[in-house]
Design a protein with these regions (language model features):
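Membrane-embedded alpha-helical bundles of multi-pass transporters/translocases
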Residues: 1-289
Length: 289
């Protein structure tokens, strides 16, 4: 719980510093439009839908003391997620101007669309890093390790804070974008020592496309993915609508959403993750008896 509170306080500080540095100028609107797309990529491919399907399947193998199968599944998902996110990010970077003009910000002026496309290419480094980090988070939670995954979002905000304070004065909004990339890397690195310390950890170079456990993850993921897609499409629609409004409208919308969801993350998400993993642990203990 404390780690979640720290994360949200750090996120609030980040939001204040960003608004202080950029106000509601067009450059920040461009950054927010670009980040909407990278958030969409991560959420659809490696976000909560995947975690909610992967963790129960992975935990079931742990309950049966079948760590070989558990890590084979984890390896397959790590490889598959990285492959999909890297290819998608590469293609998105190549067609960034078209994405911005036709999908993300059709009502921006041409110079602002160009800035958005450039920022998008920088931010596209982050989804693959977040994808790997998100899987680390699920694996650690399945092993009853909660502190480091809960601290990871704080490190992401910290990276953005460093970008605002030290890069933005000389690089402008590009400093904020590179700060976001740094934050994604810190999000991964803070979990890495705990991940490497897990027992019987074994990585294999396989995609496992025909394996029953991976197919089970896909089946569990499908209905959740539909819900995530609806939410993310709503964000994209809001972004498109905001780009046709006065300068700063998109920034105001994003800031308001961040403040509104803060209590949910601090209280509901922290309790839900802890209770979910405790329930799975209790189930494993009953099976052993």
């Amino acid at each position: 719980m404390l780690a979640f509170i720290l994360s949200n306080l750090t996120g609030l500080v980040r939001q204040v510093l960003i608004l202080k540095a950029f106000g509601t100028e067009n450059a920040l609107d461009a950054f927010n439009a670009a980040s909407t797309y990278t958030d969409l990529l991560f959420s659809l491919i490696a976000g909560g839908a995947l975690a909610s399907a992967f963790v129960p399947t992975f935990t079931a193998f742990l309950a049966k003391e079948d760590r070989t199968s558990a890590w084979r599944l984890a390896s397959a998902l790590i490889n598959l997620v990285l492959l999909i996110l890297c290819l998608t990010s590469l293609l998105s970077g190549l067609f960034a101007p078209q994405l911005v003009k036709l999908v993300l910000a059709p009502k921006f002026t041409p110079p602002l669309q160009e800035l958005t496309a450039t920022l998008l290419r920088v931010l596209l480094i982050a989804p693959a890093v977040f994808g790997l980090s998100g899987l680390f988070m699920g694996i650690l939670n399945a092993h009853q390790v909660f502190f480091w995954p809960a601290l990871a979002p704080t490190m992401y905000w910290l990276g953005m804070i460093l970008g605002v304070l030290f890069l933005a004065p000389s690089m402008g909004v590009y400093g904020l974008a590179w700060g976001a990339v740094l934050g994604a890397i810190l999000h991964l690195l803070v979990q890495l020592p705990a991940f490497l310390a897990l027992p019987a950890r074994r990585y294999s170079r396989t995609l496992g496309l025909s394996s029953p456990p991976l197919r089970q993850v896909g089946r569990l993921m499908a209905p959740r993915l539909l819900g995530v897609a609806v939410v993310q499409i709503n964000f994209v629609v809001n972004t498109i609508l905001a780009t046709g409004q006065p300068e700063g409208s998109l920034t105001a919308l994003k800031s308001a959403w961040a403040v509104m969801t803060m209590p949910q993350v601090v209280i509901a998400q922290a309790i839900a993750i802890a209770l979910s993993e405790q329930r799975r642990a209790a189930k494993r203990r009953r099976k052993r008896k």
